[in-house]
């Protein structure tokens, strides 16, 4: 009854107006699953590879080749298979691709099918996706990392860091956490406007003002938290995504906005000072993806008091994560389904992290869709943290809204992770 009888891939648009892959999977009993694949702007060199068309159509970014793979090779390989055997289906697709980075079939083709299969199987089981994937113990609602000021590759302004985030660690529910975030977001908008800054938003819904450096952005956020009636550090903590690989050049960190250059040790000390001066509890990609020595120095410096998240460093890859664990580098992994390209491998990365005492943060990409799968996966894995943008743009709020629904559905079983999500607090 749960055999796959039809798979349909199509080309749709993501939140940046670029093409992406959407996949429908239909089972023998009529159950249906649909998944749309996200895409990143700042991508790690070690990520699984998307299949794009090249040429002039959509300026080379079309995904007709990936859609053709879904409707052809992938359909032929898994039609008739049991959708409830996720591991076997994912492994079949990985073997069919045959490359180390999914460059033959395309991670966008494989992932779309992998997620749609899980959704169809969940429907066939009569279970919500978070319960189907996570089992009876899936009940933890994640603390959101809300990206309210954008810089770097996500915005057209002088700020070198990519994201400045707020974390409502003092809230008691996801519903309350979303309210905290919304109130600070709107307060920040007014303060920026009153100070003469533009209030246009970047790819992830955060503001992109022309501020001179990280401290200026953090000061605006601190003032807005207080003005909204919250206590910085107690009700709402701060987080950074430096995306340091983007400004790592010839062994140094080149801050073009500040017109400063820092070597790896100076970079680590700069981040340590920011974490000391502000209630920063999490720093993502503070060092470049292949600057392992810099990462080690940063981890030794502040890893016992600040969450250090590897995004480009680990690219949701269990093998790279195990290298980091062995070297004592970072203490957390950012989990992006399209970085690795299948649901099974995503879950494996979270499990590997948790077994080693590392935290895991479920994450969106800057190019998103209305698909809210990652909200379910955050609850399914009990990872306790989610990164899904600001409090604007429906591609971001779709995930918050899904978390609110899940919390309501869980009722008294639901537990908001709060401060406990960050083990060091």
Swiss-Prot record:
(2R)-2-phosphoglycerate binds at residues 162, 336, 365-366, 387. Binds a second Mg(2+) ion via substrate during catalysis. The keyword Secreted applies. It is an enzyme of class 4 (lyase). It is found in: Cytoplasm; Secreted; Cell surface. Mg(2+) binds at residues 241, 284, 311. Transmembrane segments: none annotated. Its cofactor is Mg(2+). GO terms for biological process: glycolytic process. GO terms for cellular component: cell surface; extracellular region; phosphopyruvate hydratase complex. The active site is at residues 204, 336. NCBIfam families: eno. This is Enolase. It comes from Brucella ovis (strain ATCC 25840 / 63/290 / NCTC 10512).
């Amino acid at each position: 009854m749960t055999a796959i009888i039809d798979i349909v891939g199509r080309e749709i648009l993501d939140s940046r107006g670029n093409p992406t892959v959407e996949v429908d999977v239909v089972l023998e009993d009529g159950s249906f699953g649909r998944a749309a694949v996200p895409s990143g702007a700042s991508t790690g060199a070690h990520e699984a590879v998307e299949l794009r068309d090249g040429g002039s159509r959509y300026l080379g970014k079309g995904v007709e080749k990936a859609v053709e793979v879904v409707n052809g090779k992938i359909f032929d390989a898994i039609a008739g298979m049991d959708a409830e055997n996720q591991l076997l289906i994912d492994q079949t697709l990985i073997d069919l691709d045959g490359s180390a980075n999914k460059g033959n079939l395309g991670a966008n083709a494989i992932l779309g099918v992998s997620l749609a299969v899980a959704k169809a199987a969940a429907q066939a089981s009569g279970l919500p996706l978070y319960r189907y994937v996570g089992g009876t113990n899936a009940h933890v609602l994640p603390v959101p990392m809300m990206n309210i000021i954008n810089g770097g590759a996500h915005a057209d302004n002088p700020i070198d860091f990519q994201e400045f985030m707020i974390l409502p660690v003092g809230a008691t529910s996801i519903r309350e956490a979303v309210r905290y975030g919304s109130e600070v977001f709107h307060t920040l908008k007014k303060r920026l406007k009153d100070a003469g800054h533009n209030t246009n938003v970047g790819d992830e819904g955060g503001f992109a003002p022309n501020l001179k450096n990280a401290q200026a952005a953090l000061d605006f956020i601190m003032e807005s938290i207080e003005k909204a009636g919250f206590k910085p550090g107690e009700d709402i903590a701060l987080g950074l995504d430096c995306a340091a690989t983007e400004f790592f050049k010839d062994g140094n960190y080149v801050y073009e906005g500040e017109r400063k250059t820092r070597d790896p040790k100076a970079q680590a000390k700069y981040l340590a000072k920011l974490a000391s001066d502000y209630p920063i509890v999490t720093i993502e990609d503070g060092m470049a993806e292949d600057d392992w020595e810099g990462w080690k120095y940063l981890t030794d410096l502040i890893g016992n008091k600040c969450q250090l998240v590897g995004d480009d460093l680990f690219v949701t890859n269990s093998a790279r994560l195990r290298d980091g664990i062995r070297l004592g580098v970072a203490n957390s992994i950012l989990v992006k389904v399209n970085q690795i390209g299948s649901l099974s491998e995503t879950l494996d990365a979270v499990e590997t992290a948790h077994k080693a005492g590392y935290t895991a943060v479920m994450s969106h990409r800057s190019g998103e869709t209305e698909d809210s799968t990652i909200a379910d996966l955050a609850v399914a894995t009990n990872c306790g943290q989610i990164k899904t943008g600001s409090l604007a743009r429906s591609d971001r709020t779709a995930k918050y809204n899904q978390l609110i629904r899940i919390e309501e559905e869980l009722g008294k079983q639901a537990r908001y992770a709060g401060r406990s999500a960050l083990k060091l607090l």
